[in-house]
Amino acid sequence: MLERLNFIENKYEELSNKISDPSVMANQKEWQKLCKEHADLEIIVNTYREYKKAQEDLESDKEMLKEESDKELREMAQEEIKELTLKLEDLERELTILLLPKDPNDDKDVFIEIRAGAGGEEAALFASNLLRMYTRYAERKNWKVETISLNATDIGGFKEVTVAVKGKGAYSRLKYESGVHRVQRVPDTESSGRIHTSTATVAVLPEVDDVDININANDLRIDVYRASGHGGQCVNTTDSAVRITHLPTGLVVTCQDEKSQLKNKEKAMKVLKARLFEAAEAERAASIAEDRKSQVGTGDRSERIRTYNYPQGRITDHRIGLTLYKLETFLDGDIDEAIEALVTEDQAEKMKNLGRVN
């Protein structure tokens, strides 16, 4: 590990020199790329330097303990040795996590697709609850949310809805939300007071760059139509809504949020690219991982990941066995406690897999 850290520190110094070079700065695209690489290494280098300083201080205290006869100074050195030993253990653990393979999509913006599952109108209302939860969470993170497309019901639910979430680290946090979410509650329409179980499916897709995936224009069928709102009524007098069908896969994407047909087409293309990229990544991951599945979950849309139990005010994440009794605040966007636990479990699994490889 130390050899790798030394290499990273040297690379960081090299990048520091490059990004301050006027000839490099003249090429803005290259300069921005180097700046990002420099910023990505900064936290590792700073932690490593703190680790080296703590090691030096520890050796110094050990030397002092060998040579010093004064009782008070010896006790002081022993106390410092104890503190520094613990600090070094913490820093070593932190460095191990920092050196884990990074998901290249973590810094990307995302598309969240929510679809009502089993449960009819109640499932559509639950899909609406999930959209509100993610919107509130995005507000807490100062992320921007844009509606791409929606298919609303008459009483305020969503058969399906797609939104874009833009902000630093959006995918790194929201990627754990992919899967089947289950709700247990008494529907407003239920006169007998029986608890019903409904589901909604969430897919979180990273927004991909043009270089990440190439789409042949001949593989697309593009249809335009008038946008509709709640209950199906027309909300636009022009054919501004866009439906794109990817003929080889049968994937269909719609966008009607913008008044401009061109903007709707651009947004729909971004979602299509994200879906095709996700499909390609899933295929690649399956071939690499074979039968091995992450404890945190595969992110498969068919995997039941979380239950929201209204009578008990309980949320249970089935991937890691986490139970929280804070349903109201959770649905208001306070989901970081669950996400942090999932991140920690994911890191532990990666470290375990790294050990298998090594």
UniProtKB/Swiss-Prot annotation:
Keywords: Cytoplasm, Methylation, Protein biosynthesis
UniProt feature coiled coil, ranges: none
InterPro entries found in the cross-reference section: PCRF, Pep_chain_release_fac_I, Pep_chain_release_fac_I_sf, Prokaryotic/Mito_RF, RF-1
Disulfide bonds: none
PTM annotation, UniProt: Methylated by PrmC. Methylation increases the termination efficiency of RF1.
SMART domains documented for this protein: PCRF
Principal subcellular localization: cytoplasm
GO cellular component: cytoplasm
GO molecular function annotations of the record: translation release factor activity, codon specific
Location relative to the cell: Cytoplasm
Pfam families for this protein: PCRF, RF-1
Modified sites of kind N5-methylglutamine: Q233
Family matches, as HAMAP family: Rel_fac_1 (MF_00093)
Family statement: Belongs to the prokaryotic/mitochondrial release factor family.
Function: Peptide chain release factor 1 directs the termination of translation in response to the peptide chain termination codons UAG and UAA.
Record protein name field: Peptide chain release factor 1
Species of origin: Clostridium botulinum (strain Loch Maree / Type A3)
